[in-house]
């Protein structure tokens, strides 16, 4: 008993010294972490200025002195494996991390459909009960919305039926499939926050650098300045009080009373820049294999701007990590019925990004959306498509990993348009075995589009026509928020939405989102 108490006392001294001496290791480093294989990885933290920090890992020893209170070392990792121990020493302080694996690390970012937890999917319990994968781990970056926001520290969690419920469903299915295929440890760093715009994950410097982005910051600054010196805090406190009152209402009462809307300001996670500073920066520059991203719903009022803003965010992330053009795989928005936003324009922006930004690739998910629910509960298919994309584009496997993509258009003698598709795999198919294909429209020189009769011709061609359009010049496919689709390749991947025309976008010249309703002071 005395020995146990003495050991506890020594541990307590170390912990207190760790806290009081100013020596820390970045929060992302914990037991059960996964470090990127075959890479130069970075370990970092804080320590008293000029003090020596020693890092020991897998037979390597690195020593560095803290400069201006910060330290960072680099280590080499080899092939996938483990477990290892990582020791970090500063004076009398020593921190040891156990059960460290070497494998591939992916950062999963975006908004609610990436955040969507496994416990919420269809048949969740069946999946969770079998989610016993000791070599798959995930780390959820704490949801810190402003600098003084107090949040609990996170830790790497080993995937099991006990921990899987909070795993991002799409990231879970992705990592499970990659792990089974490659038999290596997979680590997922989760950063998504529901409802966030893409500019929430960028810097002020980036947004102020472009005339098409600058209005975002200027609009936000004008709102903040309109409150006066202490106006925002008063309004925010009023919102907190109103929200507390609202949460006391029963379900029937909530039918008639709107939920209070949080005022825009420095504590609102919808603000531009914020989460880049308080969440993303906490895991930079943790060495990665690549990025997984599912976002865009909150930018669907500004699809034209997204054509530049999304690539700019990708480039800024890559610059911040300092790993060159590492893979950036993302999911195109699915179908969703709405009359106030323009999902089809944002999908086009995503498609263009996949072609214009190096080492990016896109999963088509139109068919996986629920027209009536922005958060579809079936995520395994999207996760599988994302994993196939990684296997084909990142890991060099010879697999079909994308769906049919429009290549060229020719006119035929009977007034039809013949469309050629790339990525047809072993052939185009109508998934529901229908005689005609859904989602096509054609137009003449007047720009009026009419639903087209479309049929598959041969292995990789589709013939479209409408008798009302005698001289068709343009075709669109799934240029809608929501609708039916059935064009796939035989490998099960859906065709990419497209249009051949260059008509002006509805969202051109729109630089900020519509204003939300102002929250009231009381119920």
Residue ranges and their predicted role:
Residues 6-7, 521:
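Short amphipathic alpha-helical "recognition" segments used for binding
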Residues 1-4:
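Positively charged n-region of N-terminal signal peptides that target proteins for export
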Residues 20-523:
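Cell-envelope and extracellular/periplasmic
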């Amino acid at each position: 008993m005395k020995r146990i108490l003495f050991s506890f006392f020594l541990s307590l001294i170390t912990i207190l010294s760790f806290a009081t001496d100013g020596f820390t290791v970045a929060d992302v480093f914990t037991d059960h972490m996964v470090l990127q294989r075959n890479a130069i990885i970075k370990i970092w933290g804080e320590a008293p200025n000029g003090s020596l920090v020693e890092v020991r890992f897998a037979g390597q020893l690195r020593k560095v002195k803290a400069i201006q209170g910060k330290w960072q070392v680099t280590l080499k990792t080899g092939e996938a494996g483990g477990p290892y121990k990582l020791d970090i020493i500063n004076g009398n302080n020593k921190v040891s991390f156990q059960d460290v694996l070497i494998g591939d690390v992916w950062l999963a970012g975006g908004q609610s459909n990436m955040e969507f937890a496994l416990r919420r999917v269809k048949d969740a319990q069946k999946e969770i009960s079998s989610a016993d994968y000791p070599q798959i781990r995930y780390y959820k970056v704490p949801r810190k919305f402003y600098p003084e926001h107090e949040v609990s520290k996170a830790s790497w969690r080993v995937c099991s039926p006990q921990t899987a419920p909070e795993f991002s469903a799409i990231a879970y299915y992705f990592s499970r499939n990659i792990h089974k295929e490659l038999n290596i440890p997979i680590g997922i760093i989760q950063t998504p926050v529901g409802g966030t715009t893409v500019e929430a994950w960028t810097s002020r410097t980036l947004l102020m650098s472009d005339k098409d982005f600058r209005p975002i910051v200027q609009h936000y600054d004008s709102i903040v300045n309109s409150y006066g010196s202490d106006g925002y805090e008063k309004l925010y406190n009023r919102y907190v009080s109103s929200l507390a009152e609202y949460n006391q209402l029963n379900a029937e009462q909530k039918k008639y009373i709107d939920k209070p809307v949080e005022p825009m300001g420095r504590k609102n996670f919808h603000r531009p820049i914020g989460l880049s500073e308080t969440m993303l920066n906490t895991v930079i520059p943790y060495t990665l294999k690549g990025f997984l991203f599912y976002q865009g719903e909150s930018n669907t009022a500004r699809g034209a701007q997204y054509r530049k803003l999304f690539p700019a965010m990708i480039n800024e992330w890559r610059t911040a990590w300092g790993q060159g053009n590492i893979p950036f795989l993302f999911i195109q928005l699915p179908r969703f019925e709405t009359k106030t936003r323009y999902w089809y324009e944002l999908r086009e922006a995503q498609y263009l990004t996949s072609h214009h930004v190096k080492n990016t690739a896109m999963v088509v998910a139109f068919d996986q959306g629920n027209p009536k629910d922005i958060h579809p509960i079936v995520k395994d298919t999207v996760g599988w498509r994302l994993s196939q994309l990684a296997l084909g584009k990142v890991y060099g496997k010879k697999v079909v990993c994308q769906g049919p993509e429009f290549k060229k258009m020719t006119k035929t003698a009977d007034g039809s348009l013949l469309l050629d598709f790339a990525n047809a795999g072993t052939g185009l198919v109508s998934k529901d075995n229908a005689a005609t294909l859904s989602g096509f429209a054609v137009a003449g020189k007047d720009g009026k589009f009419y639903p087209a009769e479309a049929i598959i011709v041969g292995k990789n061609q589709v013939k479209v026509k409408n008798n009302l359009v005698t001289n068709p010049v343009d075709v669109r496919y799934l240029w809608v928020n929501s609708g039916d689709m059935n064009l796939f390749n035989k490998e099960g991947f859906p065709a990419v939405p497209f249009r051949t025309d260059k008509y002006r976008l509805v969202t051109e010249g729109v630089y900020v989102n519509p204003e939300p309703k102002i929250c009231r002071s009381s119920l």
